[in-house]
Each structure stands twice: as structure tokens, then as C-alpha cells.
Design a protein with these regions (language model features):
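N-terminal low-complexity or simple alpha-helical regulatory segments
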Residues: 1-126
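Surface-exposed, interaction-prone regions with an acidic/low-complexity signature
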Residues: 2-17, 132-134, 141, 145, ...
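Short, well-ordered alpha-helical segments
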Residues: 13, 95, 142-150, 216, ...
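Surface-exposed helix-capping loop/turn segments at secondary-structure junctions
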Residues: 25, 160-164, 252
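N-terminal regulatory/effector-sensing and dimerization cores
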Residues: 82-204
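Extended mid-to-C-terminal alpha-helical interaction segments
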Residues: 185-264
Length: 264
């Protein structure tokens, strides 16, 4: 089967804000990375995960820096996650908000899995990137992973009455030449490299303290919209897979329906 990994176009909201801070021309950057500007105008459009990773690297390279991912996270907007973002903002507590992103993560992207491991004192959110079937390479780049984790921490800081910070962050790559030294400043906690997993841990009590903006009625209506959105995504995924399969087989001649079915 030909996989298609994508992210919600809402990610372009904080990316554009970050580009404005870094004095980078948004439209030119999108064009250079093969992203259509029309995707920015459609809140339900999907963008190739690979293209977005290239866009992040493009901005770092242009300014000869390494921390564009953190600037993106600092510019978090609920619309980044579509309806899910607003449902998370109206959650009873941070634990409920994180459980929603565990459940509806596909709205944000289909590039990884998210699992919350709950303990009496510590909760851990584990992110596992999917792999490209043909190369076994992780779909998410290191900077894409940083954006996702840092965005969740920024969200928690926006919603919580606490000066929220994780207890620790674990990353599965090396900090060669202190390239990622800036992460400690943002997360304000221990950042461990060369680990067997990608995760961050939080105090369970803090995660379960009520949020001032909690509203069950709002979250119920938003979850209905999210379920409908997921249904549309599933249909679109099938269409995209068929298109990719046809494209892959064209060099071998016009594929038959049977050929395509075998690839799905």
C-alpha cells in the first residue's frame, strides 16, 4: 500500500506568525518548498508532512539558526488543531485535553501515534513517529517532533493557571554540538537525549487540576464535529492512496482495477 502522510493546514498559522517574527517572506517560502498558498486559506486542507518538514529546515537555513521550531510553538493558536484545538481549550483539565489529542490526533496529522501512560504521580505522553514503508525512515523530522511537543507544552501554559513545565523531556537523537541547547530554556526542565523513546512527563496532580475555561457543553459539541471530520478524513485518505498507487504504477503501463486493488 502507498502511504500518504499529511498534516492539517492549520499548522501554517503558527508557521506564518513565526516567519513574520523572523522577517521571512511567507509566500516565497511556501513556493520554494512546493506548498500552495491556497492551502493556507482552506482550514480542512492537508499538506504533505515532508513539505512542512522542508519548510522548517528552509527557515532555519535561511537565518542560520536552529530554533525556528520553538518560535512556531510559541505562536500556538487553537485553530492550528482545527476544532480539536477549541475542544482542548474547553477541557476540564490538561489531562482531558491531552486525552483528546490522543483520541483525535489524526485530525492534526497521520504521521505518528500518541499514547498517554498514566501513573499515580507522573503521566507520560509518548510520541512514536511512523516510518516510510519504502525506506524505513521516520516520517517526522527532529524539528517537526520538537514543534509538536513544544506546542503541547505551550498549549498547557496558555490554559493552565500554573507556570506549566514538564518534569522531563526525552528525545531519541543526539545533541551533536549542542545544536538543541535552546530546548532546555523553553521547556525549563531536564531534556534527555539518546533515549529509547520520544516523550515528556508531567505531574499527574497538576494535569488533573480544573481549568478555568472548562466547559463540558462546548467539548460535547466539538467532539461531534470532530467525529464528522474524522469520517471525511477517512474517505479522503482512501482517495489519496488510490491516486498515489496509480502514480507509482504508471511507469509500468496503465494499471488495471485489479492492480490498484492489490496495492490498497
Amino acid at each position: 500500500m502507498t502511504d500518504y502522510f499529511s498534516v492539517l493546514s492549520g499548522w501554517l498559522i503558527p508557521i506564518k506568525r513565526a516567519m513574520d517574527e523572523w522577517d521571512i517572506d511567507f509566500n516565497s517560502a511556501l513556493a520554494d518548498c512546493g506548498i500552495k498558498t491556497s492551502d493556507f486559506k482552506d482550514p480542512e486542507s492537508r499538506i504533505s508532512a515532508e513539505r512542512v518538514s522542508q519548510l522548517i529546515e528552509y527557515c532555519n537555513h535561511l537565518k542560520k539558526r536552529h530554533d525556528f521550531a520553538i518560535t512556531v510553538a510559541e505562536n500556538f493558536h487553537p485553530g492550528t488543531f482545527h476544532t480539536l484545538g477549541y475542544a482542548m481549550m474547553a477541557s476540564n483539565n490538561l489531562y482531558d485535553a491531552f486525552k483528546r489529542i490522543e483520541r483525535y490526533k489524526k485530525v492534526v496529522s497521520n504521521t505518528c501515534s500518541i499514547k498517554i501512560e498514566e501513573g499515580p504521580k507522573v503521566c507520560k505522553l509518548v510520541l512514536t513517529p511512523f516510518l516510510y514503508e519504502s525506506t524505513n525512515r521516520p516520517v517526522l523530522s527532529q524539528n517537526s517532533i520538537i514543534i509538536f511537543i513544544a506546542t503541547l507544552v505551550k498549549f498547557a501554559r496558555e490554559c493552565s493557571s500554573h507556570n506549566f513545565k514538564p518534569q522531563e523531556v526525552n528525545l531519541n537523537w543526539s545533541n551533536t554540538g549542542d545544536t538543541f541547547q535552546f530546548l532546555g530554556d523553553f521547556f525549563d526542565c531536564l531534556v534527555n537525549f539518546d533515549q529509547d523513546e520520544i516523550s515528556f512527563s508531567c505531574n499527574t496532580t497538576i494535569l488533573k487540576e480544573p481549568l478555568l475555561g472548562g466547559n463540558p457543553l462546548i467539548t460535547q459539541s466539538h467532539e461531534k464535529m470532530l467525529n464528522e471530520f474524522l469520517s471525511r478524513l477517512d474517505k479522503n485518505d482512501v482517495v489519496q492512496i488510490v491516486k498515489n498507487s496509480i502514480h507509482d504504477m504508471l511507469p509500468l503501463g496503465t494499471p488495471t482495477q485489479t492492480d490498484i486493488a492489490k496495492q490498497i
